[in-house]
Amino acid sequence: MAEAFRGEYNQKVDAKARVSIPAPFRRVIEAGDPKFSGGRSSFVLVYGGDRSYVECYTISEMERIEERIRSLPMGTPKRRYLERNMITLALNMELDEDGRIVLPPKGREKLGISPDELKGGTEATFAGTLNKFQIWKADTYAAELAAEEEVLLPPGADMLSLLEETGL
């Protein structure tokens, strides 16, 4: 995939659970939607798995993942787990004319956004991770990011040292 999801964006979530997809992410979603010819584009929001965020994939990327799942032997625990968490616990999403989506109830539940927080207004963080992007509740994202960096990298270390294992 030539296009990649990059960057970190904080977006307001309104009382109706609407949130604007960052403009750079919209371009990648459009490029990865084979049916897009202007107007509304689509992507897949996955809320399965044991995590505090939802993952979002372009239609093309999700088709590649589905093909990999199909290649696993039917009925195996690995295939059933992936089918449940990547296919069953996923929704096709369509951006409205303003580039927004309505965060679905299952997605809001995964993020930990309560009805009271929606009424008062809350914020979501969109984090690009190459072939997908994540949507987090903003305060959860900030806490997780700080904790992860503390564990992975000593202060002052070169972050590219984490790539040494790749052999590239």
UniProtKB/Swiss-Prot annotation:
UniProtKB keywords: Cytoplasm, DNA-binding, Repeat, Transcription, Transcription regulation
Taxonomic superkingdom: Bacteria
Primary subcellular site in the record, as a coarse category: cytoplasm
Pfam families: MraZ
GO MF annotation, one: DNA-binding transcription factor activity
Cross-referenced PROSITE patterns: SPOVT_ABRB (PS51740)
Alphabetical GO biological process terms: negative regulation of DNA-templated transcription initiation
Presence of keyword Cytoplasm: yes
Compartment(s) where it occurs, according to its Swiss-Prot or TrEMBL record: Cytoplasm, Nucleoid
A single Gene Ontology CC term: cytoplasm
Assembly information from the UniProt record: Forms oligomers.
Similarity comment: family membership: Belongs to the MraZ family.
Protein name: Transcriptional regulator MraZ
Source organism: Cereibacter sphaeroides (strain ATCC 17023 / DSM 158 / JCM 6121 / CCUG 31486 / LMG 2827 / NBRC 12203 / NCIMB 8253 / ATH 2.4.1.)
Organism taxonomic ancestry: Bacteria, Pseudomonadati, Pseudomonadota, Alphaproteobacteria, Rhodobacterales
